[in-house]
Design a protein with these regions (language model features):
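Non-catalytic nucleic-acid substrate-recognition regions in nucleic-acid-modifying enzymes
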Residues: 1-27
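Amphipathic alpha-helical recognition patches that constitute DNA-binding helices
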Residues: 4, 30, 61
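Hydrophobic alpha-helical packing segments in soluble, helical-rich domains
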Residues: 23-37
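Conserved AdoMet
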Residues: 33-85
Length: 85
């Protein structure tokens, strides 16, 4: 099943809000950050292309990151470059 950026933002922000007791706007920003990381793009691009569907590999990568976040792992730990010093 193909998921659009818009559907992911709506559904997964609600999941984060419930699971981690985040405010809805904070949860939406976190989902945007995960999508930006997976798609290697900017927030502006995400907002301009809500109809874009994730490929299977993008969806798999995103789902893995989301599960880590739902378990409470800080988003900064997931998004930091492995080459950061």
């Amino acid at each position: 099943m193909q998921h659009t950026i818009q559907s992911i933002l709506t559904q997964d922000a609600a999941r984060l809000t419930t699971a981690l007791a985040l405010d809805p706007s904070g949860a939406r920003i976190e989902v945007q950050c995960l999508l930006q990381h997976v798609l290697k793009t900017s927030r502006a691009w995400l907002l301009a292309h809500p109809e874009r569907c994730l490929s299977d590999s993008e969806q798999t990568h995103y789902a893995a990151l989301l599960q880590r976040r739902l378990r409470g792992e800080p988003i900064a730990y997931m998004l930091v470059s492995q080459f950061a010093t």
